[in-house]
Each structure stands twice: as structure tokens, then as C-alpha cells.
Design a protein with these regions (language model features):
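Short coil/turn linker motifs that delimit alpha-helical repeat modules in TPR/alpha-solenoid proteins
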Residues: 37-41, 74-78, 114-116
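Amphipathic alpha-helical segments of tetratricopeptide repeats
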Residues: 28-33, 66-73, 105-110
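TPR-repeat structural position
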Residues: 8, 21-22, 59, 97
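Transmembrane alpha-helices and immediately adjacent membrane-cytoplasm interface residues
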Residues: 1-17
Length: 130
């Protein structure tokens, strides 16, 4: 039962944390019925798919999985912040500056202590306020 409710999601997140995107993608592709995962693990499944897609420059897939992950409303602020940052960055690259600013405002409303993410937010804030 645990396998169906949790799948390889913890291992996927560990692979992503270590920068092993290819291994994370292989593990994600092994999940045949993501709807059988618990709601929290479904949220992290889509979170991981969004990160893999962003890494591969697949903007549409990254946006789709980011929205799916956020819809569960079960991720921690740090993960939500990462998704908002990725969405803001993509919107900026697509010259959709108002949308980028909206994602940045949502990101700034979170309580995230991650220094790396804070630096990225400052950089994005700087280019958007020009």
C-alpha cells in the first residue's frame, strides 16, 4: 500500500536536490498511476515534474505541472517559492512582464529563508523594476 501512496517521490526529491535530474526523470516516468499517490505526494510529483521540465527548457510542461502542484496547496513555502520563481522567470523571458511581476509579488509574500532563492528573487526584482 505504501508503494502506491508514496511511490518513488522521496527518492525523486533527493535526486533533484543532488542535481541528478536524469535519474529523477527516470523515477518519475516509473510512476504509472500518479492519481493513486496520496494528495501530498501528488503535489510533490507535479512539483518534481515542473522542475525537470524547467531544466529541459520545456516551458509549457513546466507551467502545467507548476499549476497542478500549486493547486493541491500542500507544498511547503520553499517549494511554492521555487515554483513561483520559475514561473516569474519564464514570464520574464517571454516578455510577459506583468505576469512576471504577479508571480514575483506572490513569491515575496511567502516566508522563505533559503538564501539562494532570496538572491534570485532580488535579481529578478531588479530587472523587473527597470
Amino acid at each position: 500500500l505504501g508503494h502506491f501512496r508514496h511511490g518513488p517521490i522521496l527518492k525523486v526529491l533527493l535526486c533533484l536536490r543532488r542535481g541528478n535530474v536524469n535519474q529523477a526523470e527516470l523515477l518519475l516516468n516509473a510512476v504509472k498511476r500518479p492519481q493513486w499517490l496520496s494528495k501530498r505526494y501528488q503535489a510533490y510529483y507535479h512539483f518534481a515534474l515542473a522542475l525537470v521540465a524547467a531544466h529541459q527548457q520545456d516551458v509549457e510542461s513546466a507551467a502545467h505541472h507548476s499549476e497542478a502542484a500549486l493547486a493541491f496547496n500542500l507544498l511547503h513555502d520553499k517549494e511554492v517559492g521555487i515554483l513561483y520563481y520559475n514561473q516569474a522567470r519564464v514570464a520574464y523571458e517571454q516578455k510577459s512582464f506583468e505576469k512576471a511581476k504577479q508571480h514575483l509579488v506572490a513569491l515575496k509574500s511567502l516566508k522563505v529563508d533559503d538564501l539562494h532563492l532570496k538572491q534570485r528573487v532580488e535579481e529578478l526584482d531588479k530587472v523587473l523594476s527597470v
